[in-house]
Amino acid sequence: IKSNYCFVHGDTLSTLLGSFFVKRNRGNLVLLEAGHPVPGIFKHFPESVIRYIVAKISNKLIVNGESQINQLKKWNVKGSILQISTNTIYDSFIGVELNQNHNKNKVTVAIHRTENINNKIKLKLLVNFLVQISEQFDINWYLHIPTRNKLKSYNLLDELTDGNVKTLDLIQYDEFINELFSSEFVVTDGAGIVEECQLIGVPTLVWRDE
């Protein structure tokens, strides 16, 4: 670790723990997609806090826009900022073959942010919405483990099943991109999925306040 650069990405707990491990071992920490603007340090908690902490301790920060640079300047980061032309998400698309078969009745759902899954009222509103539109669309909800656990603890899984909403385990990246691509629209709270849908031209309903 001491002689190499270690790259981290995102705003999850694993991002934070990995960053602490690198710094503890005196490694050089590189943060990809650094400086995404946040509405407030304690909004989108804990994601915004994680973004801030990791940015502050990174040696190098990779950005692809002026808004990210401005955010990092507001945070007064000490690491060097390197601007690239496009988001690193483009690299993920290399080698992904898109299936041209579209299902105009399918809606793909991916919800995982803490602000949504830890709030029973918000999660119940989402479940009600999905059950309502399931009369018109085939709903496939790909569940992260924390999301599934919260739905179970709130006794909402049965409501989804009774409402003909399919709850599925996560799948491989290229398979998931094709699920997005073949959907009529996507419901998500993930910034990465929003960008992916923009790249492949799929309408997206962003399920978060800001």
Give the residues covered by each predicted segment.
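A short beta-strand/loop micro-motif in the catalytic core of glycosyltransferases
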Residues: 58-65, 139-141, 186-187
